[in-house]
Design a protein with these regions (language model features):
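Positively charged n-region of N-terminal signal peptides that target proteins for export
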Residues: 1-4
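Anion-recognition interface
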Residues: 7
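N-terminal signal peptide c-region/cleavage motif recognized by signal peptidases
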Residues: 14-15
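Generic detector of solvent-exposed, compositionally biased contiguous segments
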Residues: 18-20, 127-128
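A conserved hydrophobic secondary-structure block that centers on an alpha-helix together
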Residues: 122-144
Length: 144
């Protein structure tokens, strides 16, 4: 077992550190059946504060301004949900958790007209979903 841990650590250390880090343990892998998820935006100087979005009720017709997660550049507006849930980091009050390990992409694939970047998509989905399936549906509807 020690040999496997050491080998895994060496392989991880040798890999380029340009993507974010997720640590996920399923209920069958933990000693007490707990599910453990952690996320860190730790690539190339992306260290950030712990995000907090308190639960809220919004007026019908209220708009939400979208700013790029990486650059804070204004991208546009979308309709705000009438109710949003409490989010701390990458988990909401319903225990929905979203992580990511993006690594750039091809420049010719960038949609310059898009108004929702991946970071905003994560936080919007967490603020609006009670289940993982609901989060997927919300994210899909926002990018279609």
């Amino acid at each position: 077992m020690k040999r496997q841990i050491i080998l895994s650590a060496m392989l991880l250390a040798a890999a380029g550190a340009l993507a974010c880090t997720n640590f996920i343990v399923g209920k069958k892998a933990s000693k007490d059946g707990s599910v453990i998820c952690s996320y860190s935006a730790d690539s190339y100087g992306m260290f950030q504060d712990l995000a907090h979005f308190p639960a809220a009720h919004h007026q019908k017709g209220e708009m939400r301004q979208i700013y790029d997660w990486d650059t804070n550049k204004y991208l546009g507006e979308i309709a705000e949900a009438e109710e949003t849930y409490n989010v701390i980091g990458n988990i909401n009050e319903w225990q929905v958790t979203i992580g990511e390990t993006t690594f750039g992409g091809r420049e010719e694939m960038v949609d310059t007209t898009g108004i929702i970047d991946y970071g905003s998509l994560i936080y919007i989905a967490l603020q609006r979903s009670k289940t993982a399936r609901e989060a997927i549906n919300i994210m899909t509807s926002l990018v279609e």
